[in-house]
């Protein structure tokens, strides 16, 4: 299998956890404490809690933070956060939004005008993986920055959390790391040890290759010619990701067809979550739904030789042409 969708679909492993990590108020829980300390040390934070990476889970975080100040959310965050933020507003709470520009970057003018005390914004945009300069964001606001660190982490984030499904393939709780008293302390019996163990294990195994993007891009342009276009600048995306679009087809058509060739690609988060929805982020950039269905994202976790890359592109071009012919009939 040639897996080019790892940031959306993880390499799922068997889930194994020792009974040594089970929690009890009648023992010292040394093994869990060591695991927790290892996780906190890895990202230089002092506190760790677990919560549900879902609409209800993020709504809970928003409600907790609303007692302390105003909140802003980047429209380029995960589906679960966006849904939670919309529900938060529907309950009568105020919330500021940071929009996306046509080129996929965050609208920095929205950041400049923020009055928020807390911002949910990550070092990359979901789906396109356009990088976000959190250092610049931090220079423009005193707000606490809370980020998704699943695909990339930044030292300018004041708190980070992880998308368990995309890291492990299991819908376990998420881990949230922070300092001081940003969130309430969590009693040990409520901490999801299976999630802590699994996420840390997945992060240890996480591996990306940065040498493949330019080669794949050149070969794609060579193979597709005028049928390929780019909605975002590939120089502005994570070094191990490539985002592009193919004219006059729906991404799901080529995603499903290539799966039969054991080549796995994706359109974005709506694809990986089983929502059967085209990329929300592309639409938030100002493109119509039809364009968002053209979008395709690659992630590079393995180094391929030039012959292998050319073979993959050849298959991709062949399937694309076949789909176009069938659609024209």
Q: Where on the chain are the PLM-derived regions?
A:
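N-terminal glycine-rich, Lys/His-bearing helix-loop that initiates the first secondary-structure elements
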Residues: 1-22, 218-222, 226
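Conserved C-terminal alpha-helix-loop-beta "cap" of PLP-dependent enzymes
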Residues: 242-296
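Active-site PLP attachment segment
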Residues: 152-201
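Conserved PLP-dependent catalytic core of the aminotransferase class-I/II
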Residues: 35-44, 206-260
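PLP-dependent enzyme catalytic core of the Aspartate aminotransferase-like
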Residues: 1-4, 10-12, 282-329
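Conserved N-terminal alpha-helix of the aminotransferase class I/II PLP-enzyme fold
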Residues: 8-56, 60, 64
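Active-site phosphate-binding strand-loop segment of PLP-dependent enzymes
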Residues: 99-153
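Conserved PLP-anchoring active-site segment centered on the Schiff-base-forming lysine
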Residues: 64-82, 96
């Amino acid at each position: 299998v040639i897996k080019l969708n790892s940031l959306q679909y993880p390499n799922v492993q068997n889930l194994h956890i020792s009974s040594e990590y089970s929690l009890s108020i009648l023992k010292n829980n040394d093994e869990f404490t060591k695991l927790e300390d290892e996780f906190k040390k890895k990202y230089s934070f002092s506190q760790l809690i677990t919560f549900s990476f879902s609409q209800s889970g993020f709504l809970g975080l928003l409600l907790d933070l609303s007692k302390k100040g105003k909140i802003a959310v980047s429209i380029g965050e995960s589906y679960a956060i966006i849904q939670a933020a919309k529900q938060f507003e529907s309950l009568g709470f105020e919330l500021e939004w940071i929009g996306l520009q046509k080129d996929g970057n965050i609208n920095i003018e929205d950041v400049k005008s923020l009055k928020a005390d807390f911002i949910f914004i990550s070092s990359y945009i979901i789906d396109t993986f356009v990088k976000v300069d959190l250092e610049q964001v931090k220079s423009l606001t005193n707000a606490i920055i809370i980020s998704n660190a699943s695909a990339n982490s930044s030292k300018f984030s004041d708190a980070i959390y992880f998308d368990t499904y995309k890291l492990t393939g299991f819908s376990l709780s998420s881990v949230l790391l922070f300092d001081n008293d940003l969130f309430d302390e969590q009693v040990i019996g409520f901490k999801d040890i299976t999630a802590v163990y699994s996420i840390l294990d997945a992060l240890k195994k996480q591996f990306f290759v940065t040498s493949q993007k330019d080669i794949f891009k050149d070969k794609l342009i060579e193979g597709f010619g005028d049928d390929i276009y780019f909605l975002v600048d590939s120089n502005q995306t994570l070094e191990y990701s490539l985002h592009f679009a193919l004219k006059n087809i729906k991404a799901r058509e080529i995603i499903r067809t290539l799966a039969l060739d054991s080549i796995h690609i994706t359109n974005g988060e709506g694809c990986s979550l089983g929502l059967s929805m085209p990329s929300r982020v592309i639409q938030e950039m100002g493109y119509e739904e039809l364009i968002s269905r053209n979008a395709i994202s690659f992630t590079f976790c393995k180094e391929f030789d030039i012959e292998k890359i050319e073979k993959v592109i050849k298959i991709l071009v062949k399937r694309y042409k076949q789909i176009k012919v069938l659609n024209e009939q």
